[in-house]
UniProtKB/Swiss-Prot annotation:
<comment type="function">
    <text>ATPase which is responsible for recognizing, binding, unfolding and translocation of pupylated proteins into the bacterial 20S proteasome core particle. May be essential for opening the gate of the 20S proteasome via an interaction with its C-terminus, thereby allowing substrate entry and access to the site of proteolysis. Thus, the C-termini of the proteasomal ATPase may function like a 'key in a lock' to induce gate opening and therefore regulate proteolysis.</text>
</comment>
<comment type="pathway">
    <text>Protein degradation; proteasomal Pup-dependent pathway.</text>
</comment>
<comment type="similarity">
    <text>Belongs to the AAA ATPase family.</text>
</comment>
<keyword id="KW-0067">ATP-binding</keyword>
<dbReference type="GO" id="GO:0019941">
    <property type="term" value="P:modification-dependent protein catabolic process"/>
</dbReference>
<dbReference type="InterPro" id="IPR003960">
    <property type="entry name" value="ATPase_AAA_CS"/>
</dbReference>
<dbReference type="InterPro" id="IPR003959">
    <property type="entry name" value="ATPase_AAA_core"/>
</dbReference>
<keyword id="KW-0647">Proteasome</keyword>
<dbReference type="InterPro" id="IPR027417">
    <property type="entry name" value="P-loop_NTPase"/>
</dbReference>
<dbReference type="GO" id="GO:0000502">
    <property type="term" value="C:proteasome complex"/>
</dbReference>
<dbReference type="InterPro" id="IPR050168">
    <property type="entry name" value="AAA_ATPase_domain"/>
</dbReference>
<dbReference type="InterPro" id="IPR012340">
    <property type="entry name" value="NA-bd_OB-fold"/>
</dbReference>
<dbReference type="GO" id="GO:0005524">
    <property type="term" value="F:ATP binding"/>
</dbReference>
<keyword id="KW-0547">Nucleotide-binding</keyword>
<dbReference type="Pfam" id="PF17758">
    <property type="entry name" value="Prot_ATP_ID_OB_N"/>
</dbReference>
<feature type="binding site">
    <location>
        <begin position="237"/>
        <end position="242"/>
    </location>
    <ligand>
        <name>ATP</name>
    </ligand>
</feature>
<dbReference type="InterPro" id="IPR041626">
    <property type="entry name" value="Prot_ATP_ID_OB_N"/>
</dbReference>
Length: 560
């Protein structure tokens, strides 16, 4: 018994051993758990990577249409397929031409955007609301579908669109600078009241343009058709372009008055009441055959589109002789033989040209093809003359106004009345410009018959010259103020500006062909064979003269 009692350890010692063993096992278990967790995470990560690299390739397609059974028609690799759609894809919100993603089972699993690149085609004709006839490379024509974001947009004939050739979808409108730069589509803010010295011409234009638009019922009652176009011709700088802009502004106001009288026109929000298509004539010419004619067709297609909404449209051809000169008169080319017929076909061809007014401006109307000038095309021909003394006063009053700073000495001379002072300035300036004194002699011309005539500066005056004179006077006043003088414009500033303007124009008539120069300047009649310029000092003393005869001048070649 005593021996057994000796072999036993105390209970507290055995418990401590068991506790140490349990703690050791727990620590090992934790380390094993952590290792297993890390291994499991690595396995999961490796499995994900393996799945990622072994995933079958996905493909993209273009959505075409949805069906009631939850399937969709798509174009994939040039083939049209009907595929299932995953529940996560909002089928009702997909639009034609939109990209969709397909999985390996050829199921639509995601929606994308629209193709941002592609070939460029030009719209030739719109077919319904979702199709168009376009022209591509080598003038190949095809019918295409408008992608979802183009449906309902203002797609026009002549617009450039990107296309995906295999599906036939067009996605995006691309700005074409070569077309947009040729036509300036704007609503001018020039009124007839802003034009001076052309009251008779303005009255003739209003009778020709505004009456048919304001009273179409009376014209129909009398069997009278409104004019299709008008020609403004005359010397440079006399207001032809300004009149054309005023016509567009006046038509806009006329349309607004007509709507107020009970004939409302349904226009899009923000749409203008008139459009002014300013065609840059020389830039319209293109070295490629048929391009100029195509641009003319696009211009009139745009005009018809605007006019179809009941909006008056003015198509303005400045420097008209550069585009539509008489057929057969070309020296180095014969482009006019096809350009002129294209314009004639647009003005009075099979397609009607309602609410569109064609206005041409030229200072060489003798070079324009007669077929364009005949009645039925450019019906009204209005000559814009050089201003006489009364017209010059009217033009001066548009630029030299009482609101400008006037010099105190000049104000004191006329009772401190700004309006009276300005009127006196204008009278002095007009008297200086239109004087037939020797200091105003400009040219001596000799006609083919041997007759001679002295021309004065007043014979070459224009509205642009008057505006330039007023601007010079303002500059003189500013320079005097900066030099330490008093503020304001003086009569002396205006008279000095007149003399400076005359001096700058003395050498301009020295051309190799005086007769052509005279025609452009508005001097028509017998052929001029000799020009002698009369050069003046500021005091009016003749200091010399320069003569030039047609027969004695070596004319350069046609390409120089």
């Amino acid at each position: 018994m005593s021996q057994q009692h000796d072999d036993r350890r105390p209970p507290d010692t055995a418990d401590r051993d068991l506790a140490r063993q349990a703690t050791s096992l727990a620590e090992k278990n934790e380390r094993l758990t952590a290792a297993l967790t890390a291994a499991r995470a690595q396995l999961v990560e490796m499995k994900a990577q393996l799945e990622e690299v072994s995933k079958p390739p996905g493909s993209y397609a273009y959505f075409a249409a949805a069906h009631a059974d939850g399937t969709a028609d798509v174009y994939s690799a040039g083939r049209k397929l009907r595929l299932g759609v995953a529940p996560s894809v909002p089928l009702a919100s997909l639009r034609p031409g939109q990209e969709v993603q397909l999985n390996e089972a050829m199921t639509v699993v995601a929606a994308g955007g629209y193709e941002p690149v592609g070939e460029v085609v030009t719209v030739k004709e719109l077919i319904g609301s979702d199709r168009a006839l376009v022209v591509g490379r080598a003038d190949e024509e095809r019918v295409v579908r408008l992608a979802g974001r183009l449906i309902g947009e203002n797609v026009r004939v002549g617009d450039a669109l990107t296309i995906e050739p295999r599906t036939g979808f067009v996605f995006e409108r691309i700005p074409r600078s070569e077309v947009e730069d040729l036509v300036l589509e704007e609503v001018p803010d020039v009124a007839y009241a802003d034009i001076g010295g052309l009251s008779s011409q303005i009255e003739a234009i209003r009778d020709a343009v505004e009456l048919p638009f304001l009273h179409p019922d009376l014209f129909r009652e009398h069997g009278l058709k409104p004019p299709k176009g008008l020609l403004l011709y005359g010397p440079p700088g006399c207001g032809k372009t300004l009149i054309a802009k005023a016509v567009a502004t006046s038509l806009a106001h006329t349309a607004a008055r007509r709507d107020a009288d009970g004939e409302p026109a349904e226009l899009p929000d923000g749409a203008a009441r008139s459009y002014f298509l300013n065609v840059k004539g020389p830039e319209l010419l293109n070295k490629f055959v048929g391009e100029t004619e195509r641009h003319i067709r696009l211009i009139f297609a745009r005009a018809r589109e605007r006019a179809s909404q009941g909006i008056p449209v003015v198509v303005f051809f400045d420097e008209m002789e550069s585009l539509f000169r008489t057929r057969g008169t070309g020296v180095s080319s014969d482009v006019e033989t096809t350009i002129v017929p294209q314009l004639l076909a647009e003005i009075d061809g099979v397609e009607r040209l309602d609410n569109v007014i064609v206005i041409g401006a030229s200072n060489r109307e003798d070079m324009i093809d007669p077929a364009i000038l005949r009645p039925g095309r450019l019906d009204v021909k209005i000559k814009v003359e050089r201003p006489d003394a009364e017209a010059a006063r009217d033009i001066f009053s548009k630029y030299l106004v009482a609101d400008l700073p006037i010099h105190p000495d000049d104000l004191a001379e006329y009772g401190n009345d700004a309006a009276t002072t300005v009127a006196a300035m204008i009278d002095r300036a007009v008297g200086r410009m239109y004087s037939t004194a020797p200091e105003n002699e400009f040219l001596e011309v000799t006609y083919a018959s041997g007759d001679k005539e002295v021309l004065y500066f007043k014979d070459f005056n224009s509205g642009a010259m008057i505006q330039n004179i007023v601007d010079r006077a303002k500059k003189h006043a500013i320079k005097d103020l900066l030099a330490g003088g008093r503020r304001g414009i003086r009569v002396d500033h205006v008279l000095e500006a007149c003399v400076t303007e005359f001096k700058e124009n003395e050498d301009l008539p020295n051309t190799t062909n005086p007769d052509d120069w005279a025609r452009i300047s508005g001097k028509k009649g017998e052929r001029i064979v000799f020009i002698r310029t009369i050069v003046q000092k500021k005091s009016g003393e003749t200091v010399g003269s320069v003569a030039r005869a047609v027969e004695n001048v070596a004319t350069p070649g046609q390409y120089l």
